[in-house]
């Protein structure tokens, strides 16, 4: 998961689902537990949120489900003040947001192919600038999510992986 630049000091939401769909229609959940992510901090950082084993196959689509219900006080816009402006996320009609599902179709010429004993990388980029319209007077941010997926993540970003370190081998470089 990564993010394109935006005007937010904080944009913390829960990712409650990250699903991939194979070319035969099978849907695989890749996120074992919900993850809280601050997208404002992922502009120059890629975060691996799931290293779970994914069954072999050719994956052609995906979806990411974000939960905004607990995030209304965790979205802060840079308004020029020292602490920023806390805004409440709403949909296009002004109603408070709950869960939002973002669908993405992978490029047909570059599907995600998972095989036994090989690593594969898929980057989801949640574009904050394109996805959000801020109304500072109302203290709201209207969310219309834009998600882009690519099979090869950008090399220009640092990579952060969550989890326990099982072991290292300096001689083998692993």
State where each predicted segment sits.
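A short, solvent-exposed, low-complexity linear motif enriched for acidic/polar residues
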Residues: 1-174
